[in-house]
Amino acid sequence: MLKYYKYYFLVCCLVSLAACSNTRYLPKGEKLYIGADIKIEGDSLIKNEKKALRTELKGLIRPKPNSVFLGLRPKLLAYNIAGTPKKAKGLRHWLKYKIGEPPVLASNVGLQNNRLIIQNRLENRGFFHALVKGDTTSNKRKVKANYRAVPGPQFLINSVTFITDSSLLEKAVTATAAKTLLKPGEPFNLDVIKGERDRIDQTIKDQGFYYFGPDNLLVKVDSTVGNHKVNLFVMVKPETPRLARISFSIGDIYIFPNFSLAQTFADTSKSNVVFTEGFYINDKENTFKPSVYSRSIFFRSGDVYNRKNQILSVSRLTSLGTFKFVKNRFERNESAKKPTLDAFYYLTPLPRKSLRGEVLGTTKSNNLTGSELSLSWKNRNTFGGAEQLQIRGYGSFEVQISGTQHGYNTYRLGTENTLSIPRFMVPFFGFNTSNAFVPRTKFMLGYEILTKRGLYTLNSFRASAGYNWKENIRKEHELNPISINFVKPTNVSQLYSDSVANNITLAKTIEKQFIIGSTYSFTYTDQLEAARRNNIYFKGNIDIAGNIPGLIQGANYKTGDTAILFGAKYSQYIKADVDLRYYLKTGRESKIASRIILGFGYPYGNSSELPFIKQFFTGGSNSIRAFRARSVGPGTYRQENANFDNFLPDQSGDIKLEFNTEYRLKLFSIVNGALFVDAGNTWLYNNNPSKPGAQFSKDFLNELAVGTGFGLRFDLSFLVLRTDLAFPIRKPWLTVGNRWVIDQVDFSAAQWRRENLVFNLAIGYPF
């Protein structure tokens, strides 16, 4: 026990030394600014309102103190101990200017300026009688700022009146009153008033008032009502310019599809233009079909100007993936009989054809390391309608650099060819979406040869035809009415064939598989809305295969009536899975991320289990990180050679349940940390006598594998390098009552570390 006290005393001494060392480097007469505190006094607000207001006001105070971690200031310490670098490179320069941060001095704190900022914010929130005071407290060479705010009563909105007359503009402004953000009974808030001006501006611009702006609106505040209330009057400023009061229509539409940035936007000459489908097009080489513009530009001559259509048109042209830059402008046509704007679109195309090579490095939690070389050729305008054709060839290898397995090397060689057409191609129907995102019809054809050296070769053919479209920035759909997979094994070695008798899972790997069906995927995410405190990601998939041939041939594996198509037993099943993620910000640089995965496959007719390539797996760097990839389940089943001396694990199932949660926080500079817990398993839908304990049952919760650990993430801006160290605390294959193994955790034991610690190295976050 005494030695632990010594360690504790040593840690305390080191912490104190680090804290004191930061102030000894300060210039003479200076003190270190360690932050500010603000107290909300008075009884006009309840406790929760005071807390929220305090957080808001504290965020306004400047400067920010040096960052603190576990009571220390590591960045300031790094800055100090680096001294003065002699050159603009090297370790000391990196430590001082990349990792470290200079001391925030008390002399740089402007109490009066911060007091006025707080006072102003309170008044903007309707606390018109607020009082704010500020002072400092010193402790040796450290200074803390203290602010005291007495908000007083918050003024509420009594009434909202839209002032109007007979003019077209003011009638249009008044017509927006039904959707006003200013509500009687709500607190006065300057930000809401600014939002109301922007709302009116957006609505007015959609009615042709191109030159109108939010600055042309005035909201007068009458605080003489009494009883801490105000009356608001919304009106158009009397000095609003004449052009801002006029509603404009669209005149001629000019398109320059081969525009160079070296040209000037003043080039509005009608020479060399051809009038087609309502557009004046300057395209002597006929690079693009006119239908590209008619599907992408939402204006037509004679339409009332609409800013929404302006934004949609630019976004649609950009989303084609054919143009590098898209710019547009509007010019008043003074010779027109009515107020008219001519529209100009300047399109700078990307190179029509491109060739791209990539070299990738991979490392997996099953000790496989490898590399991939790929070469892609792309044509961004294959048939003149902005169709994108991509032909990709690739080759890769994976070798085992550690572990107990023999490590049979894996080689892949394949090609994947896709044609993406920027519209829906539906037989007997023709329609177009009216949002900023381009709908696409996609065709894919691929072939791959996978060779597990000394074991077997798999020949895979893939083909699909379908659609991809977005409803909006949050929702995306992908539908493939036709999806084909054909896998044929060859060159199966005698060694592998002999091993199948001892490991039934190995037989699934080399089964001939033929899958023909349809797939649908729906994705919802609000992660692009970074200002939200919580974010959600949802993805659901449905996969249906073998129904039509199954109905025609009447296949039923239970009675032995299995059917063959093109020389292979085709798969028949329904499969669905969902991936739901929730992100909760717990601080400025910390969050809790959680995920749940539910997967269910129902094999029937011609199949007793899902085909191997469609089954669910758990374990690995993006799953349950305390277990090797594909090594968990199904259920409590465990292969007798549990250490997988001969071959790497490849356990799978028809049903999947997985939970993950991790606490993410910023440590310093580019280094982030995480603490995590993972749980899950897979099961078979039907009973398999060769895999006892693998079938799903009511005791599934008692069969979950659980692991925990911690990790570091190195955020290099262009990629995130992730390292996770995990270990199991629950092993489902053990007997009931002995599955929890948390009491066996012993980091000091070499054998425990060898059998349980799993190191994961990966790119990007696991979810």
What is the role of each PLM region?
Residues 357, 389-393, 443-445, 538-542, ...:
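Membrane-embedded beta-strand positions of outer-membrane beta-barrel proteins
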